């Protein structure tokens, strides 16, 4: 089988690097790199929940996605300067939030909010899937931080790991983790979000240049799930290291009555 322009096999990921503790202030901070795509993912913890959730005793997780002006070849204006958030940005922000809420027990957070921020430093295809993959690691560190602070009712609120990958049909071949040069000419383009328990969170797919049969969809899903298995290994390896910052001290234990 002939190799792709960058030398990879069709089912081969770009080099993936997950760096924890990329910045110091958030409870979780990760730089995730899929080849030349680089995304900073942070998870910040704040007391309180949105107004519509107050009094529920449950927490919340929300996410925002943005691209730096010079993340692509041609500089783009900041959406904050334009005065409105674009439809693509809103769609990806909601996708990241949905994906991560699928793995966490919000009741265990109490009335606290975890805010996920994914900022694309450099884009070369697959920014949303890289963001989800990195944000899960940042979320895991935020959960560790909350546990150390004594703010969790369940010390293990994460039920599974979450990772995502792009997959497409390019030149008639199913390929995973598309860089921009492939993504821009793909006949079929898809993003797959999966759990490490073998289930799916979300599938976004479309025929860009042509329709495609069910058999192609099955091949794409098989390729994507094979790629996410590799990503889960990388996430676990990254999280095997100690927490990369200083953990808070939890509340002092209450004295027993009469002591």
From Swiss-Prot:
Record carries keyword Nucleotidyltransferase: yes
Family matches, as SUPFAM superfamilies: Ribonuclease PH domain 2-like, Ribosomal protein S5 domain 2-like
Alphabetized PANTHER family for the sequence: EXOSOME COMPLEX COMPONENT (PTHR11953), EXOSOME COMPLEX COMPONENT RRP41 (PTHR11953:SF0)
Record field: catalytic activity: tRNA(n+1) + phosphate = tRNA(n) + a ribonucleoside 5'-diphosphate
Gene3D superfamilies in alphabetical order: GHMP Kinase, N-terminal domain
The protein's name in its UniProt record: Ribonuclease PH
Similarity comment text for this entry: Belongs to the RNase PH family.
Complex and partners: Homohexameric ring arranged as a trimer of dimers.
A GO MF label: 3'-5'-RNA exonuclease activity
Keywords tagged on the record: Nucleotidyltransferase, RNA-binding, rRNA processing, Transferase, tRNA processing, tRNA-binding
Function: Phosphorolytic 3'-5' exoribonuclease that plays an important role in tRNA 3'-end maturation. Removes nucleotide residues following the 3'-CCA terminus of tRNAs; can also add nucleotides to the ends of RNA molecules by using nucleoside diphosphates as substrates, but this may not be physiologically important. Probably plays a role in initiation of 16S rRNA degradation (leading to ribosome degradation) during starvation.
EC supergroup of this enzyme: transferase
EC number: 2.7.7.56
GO biological process: rRNA catabolic process; rRNA processing; tRNA processing
